[in-house]
């Protein structure tokens, strides 16, 4: 067990709460002590919802452990059913309650309730939040549809042609506390409608029990978020023969591939590759002279699997960036992330220790970081611009306005979010030229991605560190002053080159002259 101040994912019962809160008419009875009710704040403070999640806690205390906690579970189940009258009931336990082995799901299933009861067994000490969300959705769909499973799974995704209607698809995976899920659903619905494709059911976000029963009526399932929906899509494919799309439409290229995959599966003519150029501003800008100075920028990417893989493709294929680091905290997505990293000549970082991620980030020395809320903090300490691309996130990454990541408009949002921190670097450099003015000190810099005074003080402090080994070099005062004249977004690269040159020629101090010599050496 590790003691930490940050975790990328909560325990699996938080994932179950996300599914219950995303749906209509579903209630979750959670066997948990009083201290485990903190998760409510995630929905009211981060997601900024107007209502609490539909969760009833048993809230047992230490004195209850000497009595019959099983009866406590039954009482809370009855009270929840009488009060909320749900269409389906989820019953599970938190990480703490798992230790006392009350098996609340089995207790609830033996109470003879009239609505479907889904027992959730979520191993809190080996699995985490995204797995818990995926398992909850899978168990709920499986429990509600088990009576509808045909003897032989026969499903023709092109049957809409014989039935004289438009093709229908299900969007699976969007949930509360997902990254821009609400906006992604609206954007993908708009995108599909433009191509003559109707959306039958969106689940779990906004879906009810009756909607789940209608899932097999669609022609195709679309797996928008593999972390949450892939296991459900695989079950529907095995038992109902329903195919599903595997391309996540984040970025111009991925959106086009997504449309081609969906159209091909439904028997429609694939759209033109030029559609992205007409609908999104990203392709034009990345080919324009204005973006030339952004070409080759070093980018470090870390987040959930789907968004990290999509970001790597956008950076390498659409914006001309150089990906110098790629990783995820989601072990369930380790295989596709490793494959994406291998295609870029990298070794993927599969890790849920934020300190190890920060160390890898510092070693890669990127000029832009794309990550989670924690990478924003780490990048700020290192003086590197950052954009958040994935959960976990803070309230500023849950905008009230529409801000999707998927589809053509999502590509525009990504274009703004990722390029602006680098564009702001030019302004910071100009401000740095007027450093003597009291209004333009390091601590007053204008965007969150820059470390400000802490970054500058960290750099100057390096010159005060005593000699550690033979390869250690020291920066003189005039060398540091000259280094500060270089724009911050390439300063790290210049520092590394100068130190490498000094070691190569046997110089123990780096002055302004050494810096000029290093510049000439690497340009030769």
UniProtKB/Swiss-Prot annotation:
Task: Give the record's cofactor note, including how many are bound.
Answer: Binds 1 [4Fe-4S] cluster per heterodimer. The cluster is bound at the heterodimer interface by residues from both subunits.
> Which UniProt keyword terms apply here?
4Fe-4S, ATP-binding, Chlorophyll biosynthesis, Iron, Iron-sulfur, Metal-binding, Nucleotide-binding, Oxidoreductase, Photosynthesis
Residues holding substrate: 425-426
Q: Which reaction is the catalytic activity of this chain?
A: chlorophyllide a + oxidized 2[4Fe-4S]-[ferredoxin] + 2 ADP + 2 phosphate = protochlorophyllide a + reduced 2[4Fe-4S]-[ferredoxin] + 2 ATP + 2 H2O
- State one Pfam family annotation: PCP_red
Q: Which residues form the active site?
A: 290
Establish whether keyword Nucleus is in the entry.
Answer: no
Note whether Metal-binding occurs among the keywords.
yes
One GO process term, biological-process aspect:
light-independent chlorophyll biosynthetic process
Cofactor(s), by name: [4Fe-4S] cluster
Family listed = Belongs to the ChlB/BchB/BchZ family.
Q: What do we know about how this protein assembles, alone or with others?
A: Protochlorophyllide reductase is composed of three subunits; ChlL, ChlN and ChlB. Forms a heterotetramer of two ChlB and two ChlN subunits.
The protein's role, per its UniProt record: Component of the dark-operative protochlorophyllide reductase (DPOR) that uses Mg-ATP and reduced ferredoxin to reduce ring D of protochlorophyllide (Pchlide) to form chlorophyllide a (Chlide). This reaction is light-independent. The NB-protein (ChlN-ChlB) is the catalytic component of the complex.
Q: What is this protein called?
A: Light-independent protochlorophyllide reductase subunit B
Which organism was this protein described from? Parasynechococcus marenigrum (strain WH8102)
Name of the gene: chlB
